[in-house]
């Protein structure tokens, strides 16, 4: 949701030039500096229904190559109704891998607006691992210097989804499906080229064998 961190600034001023040490505090300027969050719902399909998947690990980064990690620490374990919460770590804290619980939902909170990359780092046996990171863009909207909502746009395998929040306790949810086996690269990538070349090679072998078989029959 939209989480304000309130900063106050006070200035003391003196009306007595002969006694500059005595100050009168001004009315504090209050500024809300917002941080943002999003929730990951990790699931697999069973009988055409979404079923939560536990034991999936994620790490968050600020770059596409996943070198600059945004370290997080677990704030709460959650329950069936509320996601397990991982907040942005403080400078003195060591980060951890965010792991989906039995109900499959984890929330990343305390984030600045901007672009992030969510990488699946641990996958349970029997399920696929995502072939690349999910790109996540957090964009706030302000009206008269007041935050009214923010959008979370996430992109994976050329599929783009936008979810938004305009309430303090509303966390935009990123839906991430796991399938059994290994996920193929998206169509149009190098994976598709490799499979196309392999298909052409197999077809050529079949045609050569067929031609040789016909020649033997004629001879």
Language-model regions, residue ranges each:
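Solvent-exposed loop/turn and edge beta-strand elements of beta-rich ligand-binding domains
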Residues: 1-219
């Amino acid at each position: 949701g939209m989480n304000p961190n309130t900063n106050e600034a006070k200035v003391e001023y003196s009306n007595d030039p002969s006694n500059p040490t005595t100050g009168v505090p001004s009315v504090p300027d209050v500024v809300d500096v917002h941080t943002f969050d999003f929730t990951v719902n990790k699931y697999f399909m069973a009988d055409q229904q979404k079923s939560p998947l536990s034991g999936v690990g994620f790490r968050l980064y600020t770059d596409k190559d996943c070198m600059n990690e945004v370290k997080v620490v677990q704030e709460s374990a959650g329950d069936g109704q509320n996601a397990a919460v991982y907040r942005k770590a403080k400078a003195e804290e060591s980060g951890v891998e965010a792991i989906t619980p039995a109900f499959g939902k984890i929330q990343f909170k305390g984030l600045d607006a901007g672009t992030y990359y969510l990488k699946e780092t641990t996958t349970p046996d029997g399920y696929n691992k995502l072939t690349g990171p999910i790109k996540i863009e957090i964009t706030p909207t302000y009206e008269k210097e007041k935050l009214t909502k923010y959008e979370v746009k996430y992109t994976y395998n050329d599929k783009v989804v936008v979810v938004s929040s305009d309430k303090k306790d509303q966390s935009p949810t990123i839906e991430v499906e796991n399938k059994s086996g290994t996920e193929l690269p998206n169509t149009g990538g190098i994976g598709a080229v490799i499979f196309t070349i392999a298909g052409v090679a197999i077809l050529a072998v079949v045609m050569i064998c067929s031609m040789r078989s016909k020649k033997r029959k004629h001879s």
